[in-house]
């Protein structure tokens, strides 16, 4: 005989519909309203029935909880209910009978009701529904939930929660979307099981393919484990809908490195599903004026990231630094970012400082494996990009050659990358593209110029437009360089140092055009190139200086500019000295009133360096 303890009362979950209701069973409901012929009872937000006045057994008011038995479900969907008075019973939740599917399988479920389990990657409130971005082991999908226009649906659901979504697969604006009936947070063993399943699957999915570098190189072979690690981190960020900020030095080498990675990441974002324009708000490439991550850079990036986190419910970003990020000059920015637990990976060829790695989760640098700055950031970035998404290889394999000539690499890898694309791009063509990049980026300032840069690098497929654009940019750049050189070269001062090095000095503040192309750094480089040709086979050092800075270029003198700058910082009190760069190419900053003292101390150090015989 059944006792009250054995009586089961069913509670319909939010996503349940009429197909989940059974005649004869008792359900927990809520009084919705009254009519002359009875009382309307809601079993959930979607289902209601009528308790005829002859079947009512107690007095009620709106929103009272009641127990009702389903007497009949009519062909038209109306439900006849009968009130039940039971003091002791057990409540059992009824979940909607929906098949749990992977996000990757949703295109085959159009028009059907499904269940999806995954992690909340983004919560965006629109003027209409709330859009939840859900990530599972197979992909990313938007879920629309609507209460009323502009009102946050399911406020209890937060970022990074593991949830179960029940809803119908629909097409909205030619884009797949789940229109939710119910979203519930999983907890306990169910949450752990789903999170573990997703983590394990994503970890395997993020593993890069086993591929070799484009060219034969001991340095690149030795760097492959770290490049694979960095590529895996980036791939996992894409698969979990984590925003990515890519910062790079604003020269040809840095641009080539960053654009190679950009092509790989953007194409991977598009392949992973989600919004059709996800590559624009989940990925941002930004040039840095200095060859290190300045306070100005981290301030801008943090400002954007925090606003996007608050306004659009995005995760905090993964930051990729390329052609910068390896030196002590980057440390103040890393310290600020660490307050917000922002992860960093670095792909750089500047001489690294040991204190930096504690801030990074991945660091590709040729110095770590016995290489040097001749293996440029553009070469490294392209190899990492191939690991991120091998399908972009044919589009980007010319970028290392451009980066190598643009950064004046003398490493054997430069010639190998040039040989790789010689049938399409001559060495002169690569030099022209590198110059065009430098020239165009000067006018772009802090803008990435995504589409213009793609045309300069011939990534769009319009060869005729690429050729016309590069020719125009090179013509403009060379004209301005010649104007600058005609103004500068007569004012170069020469000295012969005790070690036999030929030192040349040019005050670019008073003997060069300001606020135009080429800027002081490139002006100093162009002066240096001309002086090297005039002094073929001799050790040459060029310093282009202004009121509070100096730019160094060297050939045949064994200097270590970062170390020299650190030593001068300690040896010249009141100099306010900072700077760095590569071993033989770099810059130094100081206070204006100490310029002469600092420059003489710098020249003394250069004179103590050994020279190439």
Enumerate the language-model features and the residues they cover.
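Single-stranded RNA-binding regions, centering on S1/OB-family and related RNA-binding modules
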Residues: 1-117, 122, 126-130, 139-150, ...
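Short beta-alpha connecting loops at secondary-structure transitions
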Residues: 52, 142-143, 362-371, 383, ...
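N-terminal small/polar loop signature for handling phosphorylated ligands or for N-terminal nucleophile
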Residues: 144-146, 253, 267-345, 352-355
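An N-terminal, well-structured beta->alpha segment
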Residues: 199-246, 254-255, 263, 267
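Gly-rich Lys/Arg/Thr-decorated short loops/hinges at beta-loop-alpha junctions or inter-strand turns
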Residues: 206-217, 276-286, 505
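A structured phosphate/pyrophosphate-recognition subdomain
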Residues: 239-246, 250-252, 354-510, 527, ...
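Flexible glycine/proline-rich, aromatic-decorated loop/lid segments
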Residues: 345-346, 350-365, 560-574
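Glycine-rich, acidic loop segments that terminate in or are immediately followed by a histidine
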Residues: 502-613
């Amino acid at each position: 005989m059944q006792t009250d303890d054995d009586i089961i009362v069913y509670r319909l979950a939010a996503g349940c519909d009429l197909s989940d209701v059974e005649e004869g069973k008792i359900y927990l409901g809520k009084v919705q309203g009254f009519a002359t012929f009875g009382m309307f009872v809601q079993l959930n937000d979607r289902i209601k029935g009528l308790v005829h006045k002859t079947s009512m057994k107690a007095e009620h008011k709106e929103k009272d909880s009641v127990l009702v038995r389903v007497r009949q479900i009519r062909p038209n969907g109306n439900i006849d209910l009968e009130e039940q008075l039971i003091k002791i019973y057990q409540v059992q939740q009824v979940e909607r009978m929906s098949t749990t599917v992977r996000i990757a399988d949703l295109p085959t479920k159009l028009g059907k009701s499904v269940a999806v389990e995954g992690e909340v990657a983004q919560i965006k409130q629109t003027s209409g529904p709330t859009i939840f971005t859900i990530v599972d082991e197979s992909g990313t999908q938007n879920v629309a939930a609507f209460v009323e226009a502009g009102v946050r649906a399911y406020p209890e659901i937060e970022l990074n929660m593991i949830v179960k979504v029940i809803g119908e697969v629909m097409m909205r604006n030619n884009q797949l979307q789940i229109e939710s009936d119910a979203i519930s947070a999983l907890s306990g063993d169910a949450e752990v099981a789903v999170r573990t399943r997703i983590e394990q699957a994503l970890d395997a999915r993020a593993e890069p393919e086993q591929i070799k570098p484009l060219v034969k190189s001991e340095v690149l072979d030795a760097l492959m484990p770290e490049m694979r690690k960095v590529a895996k981190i980036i791939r996992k960020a894409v698969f979990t809908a984590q925003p990515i900020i890519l910062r790079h030095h604003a020269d040809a080498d840095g641009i080539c490195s960053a654009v190679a990675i950009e092509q790989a990441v953007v194409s991977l974002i598009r392949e992973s599903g989600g919004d059709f324009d996800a590559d624009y708000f989940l990925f941002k490439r930004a040039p840095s004026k200095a060859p290190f991550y300045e306070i100005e850079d981290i301030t801008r990036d943090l400002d954007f990231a925090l606003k996007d986190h608050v306004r659009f419910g995005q995760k905090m970003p993964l930051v990729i630094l390329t052609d910068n990020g390896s030196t002590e000059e980057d440390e103040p920015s890393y310290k600020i970012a660490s307050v917000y637990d922002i992860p960093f990976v670095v792909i750089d060829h500047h001489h690294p400082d040991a204190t930096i790695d504690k801030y990074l989760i991945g660091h590709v640098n040729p110095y770590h494996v016995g290489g040097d700055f001749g293996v440029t950031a553009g070469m490294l970035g392209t190899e990492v990009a191939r690991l991120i998404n091998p399908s972009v290889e044919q589009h980007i394999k010319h970028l290392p050659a451009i980066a190598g000539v643009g950064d004046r690499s003398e490493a054997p890898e430069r010639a190998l990358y040039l040989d790789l694309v010689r049938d399409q791009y001559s060495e002169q063509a690569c030099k022209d593209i590198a110059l065009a990049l430098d020239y165009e980026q000067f006018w772009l300032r802090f803008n990435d110029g995504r589409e213009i840069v793609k045309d300069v690098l011939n990534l769009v497929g319009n060869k005729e437009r690429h050729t016309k654009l590069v020719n125009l940019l090179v013509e403009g750049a060379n004209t301005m360089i010649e104007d600058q050189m005609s103004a500068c070269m007569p004012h170069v001062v020469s000295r012969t140092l005790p070690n036999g090095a030929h030192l040349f000095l040019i005050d670019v503040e008073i003997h060069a055009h300001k606020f135009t192309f080429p800027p002081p750094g490139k002006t100093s480089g162009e002066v240096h190139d001309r002086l090297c040709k005039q002094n073929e086979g001799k050790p040459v050092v060029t310093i282009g200086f202004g009121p509070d800075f100096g730019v160094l270029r060297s050939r045949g003198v064994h200097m270590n500019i970062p170390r020299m700058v650190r030593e001068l910082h300690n040896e010249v009190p009141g100099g306010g000295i900072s700077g760095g760069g590569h071993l033989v190419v770099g810059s130094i900053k100081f206070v204006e009133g100490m310029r002469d003292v600092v420059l003489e101390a710098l020249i003394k150090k250069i004179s103590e360096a050994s020279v190439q015989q």
